[in-house]
Amino acid sequence: MSRTAEVRRDTKETQIRVWVDLDGTGASEVSTGVGFFDHMLDSFARHGGFDLKVETKGDLHIDMHHTVEDTGIVLGQAIKESLDGFKGIRRFGHAYIPMDETLSRCAIDLSNRPYLIWKTDFRTPKVGDMDTELFKEFHHAFAMNAGACVHLECLYGTNSHHIAESGFKALARALRQAVELDPKTHGHAPSTKGVL
C-alpha cells in the first residue's frame, strides 16, 4: 500500500506543491524562499522519516505570512490524503525533544478533529529573517488541514532558534509514531466509531 500524496494549491498570494511519502527515509527537497523555514521543513522530514518535496512561491515582497501559513495548509492536506481515512494507523504519538537549553514536547491525535494547543513563547521577534509569530500560524494551518489534534509546548528554553527547531522535531517525532501502521487495527480506523 502506497502512502503518498501530492497536493497543489494556487492562489493570488501563493503557488504551492507538496509531495509526501509517509514510508520514506527522511529525504527532502524544500524551497519556500524563506531560509530558516526551509531548514525547519527539512528537519521535519528527517525526524519524521517522511520523504518530502515542497515548492512554494509566495508574495515575499509583502512578507512571509502567506508563504508560511499556506505551506502549512498544503502540507497538512498532503499528510491527511496520504493516510487514506486514517485506517490502520496507531493514531496517537508523543515526543520530548531536547536541544541544548531547550526542551519541547508534542502530543498528537490523528482523530480528524483538528485542534491546536500552542504553549510556546519566543524571546526574540525573529529567527534569522523569519518572524517568530509565524511558527504558530504554520502549526495551526498544519493541524487544521491534517485533521490532527496537536498539543505543542516549549517547557523551557531561551534561544529562539532552539525553541523553534525543537518544536518542529517534536511534531515530526510524534507524527512519526501516530502514522505508523498498527497490525492490531486490522486495517480499520482506530476508533470505537469505526471511522475517523
UniProtKB/Swiss-Prot annotation:
It catalyses: D-erythro-1-(imidazol-4-yl)glycerol 3-phosphate = 3-(imidazol-4-yl)-2-oxopropyl phosphate + H2O. The keyword Lyase applies. Keywords: Amino-acid biosynthesis, Cytoplasm, Histidine biosynthesis, Lyase. It is found in: Cytoplasm. SUPFAM superfamilies: Ribosomal protein S5 domain 2-like. GO terms for biological process: L-histidine biosynthetic process. Pathway: Amino-acid biosynthesis; L-histidine biosynthesis; L-histidine from 5-phospho-alpha-D-ribose 1-diphosphate: step 6/9. Its EC number is 4.2.1.19. Gene3D superfamilies: Imidazole glycerol phosphate dehydratase, domain 1. One of its GO terms (cellular component) is cytoplasm. CDD domains: IGPD. One of its GO terms (molecular function) is imidazoleglycerol-phosphate dehydratase activity. Belongs to the imidazoleglycerol-phosphate dehydratase family. NCBIfam families: PRK00951.1-5, PRK00951.2-1, PRK00951.2-4. This is Imidazoleglycerol-phosphate dehydratase. It comes from Phenylobacterium zucineum (strain HLK1). The lineage of its organism: Bacteria, Pseudomonadati, Pseudomonadota, Alphaproteobacteria, Caulobacterales. The gene is hisB.
